[in-house]
From Swiss-Prot:
The gene coding this protein: rlmH
EC numbers: 2.1.1.177
Location(s) in or outside the cell: Cytoplasm
Family matches, as Gene3D superfamilies: 3.40.1280.10
Residues that coordinate or bind S-adenosyl-L-methionine: 73, 104, 123-128
InterPro entries: Alpha/beta_knot_MTases, RlmH-like, tRNA_m1G_MTases_N
Protein name as annotated: Ribosomal RNA large subunit methyltransferase H
Keyword Methyltransferase assigned: yes
Amino acid sequence: MKIQMIAVGTKMPAWVETGFTEYQRRFAKDMTLELIEIPAGKRGKNADIKRILHIEGEKTLAAIPKGNRIVTLEVTGKPLDTHELAKNMEKWQLDGRDVSLLIGGPEGLAPECIAASEQKWSLSNLTLPHPLVRIIVAESLYRGWSLNNNHPYHRE
């Protein structure tokens, strides 16, 4: 199964790329994690945020391969503990489809992305910086994968 993380924002600090890549490379051949970056719209003093969100949403949806399961990361989504995420990942694999995880920009995801979502996942009630979310999600996915594959990474 391939999991695509489709995230609004480019030009992340080196520590973000290093952290994401560290977990990305750990997956075995049966599970791959790919990052697709969507350029964020320019946000200035008088920016039309609704329009920017719409454009980001169109670009995000265009990056999703046909047939992929769409999972959005949202504050209002369902919080998952490690075991619940692992069970979800197991279901995703049995479903036979690849997964696109959508991460919005500073104002979140466009309404059209949320509408296309099959599952909404909340990482936390905290507001997290978007660069850090990439690493947290990559690590969480790796931890879930390790649980499903009896890999010693996760310890109770």
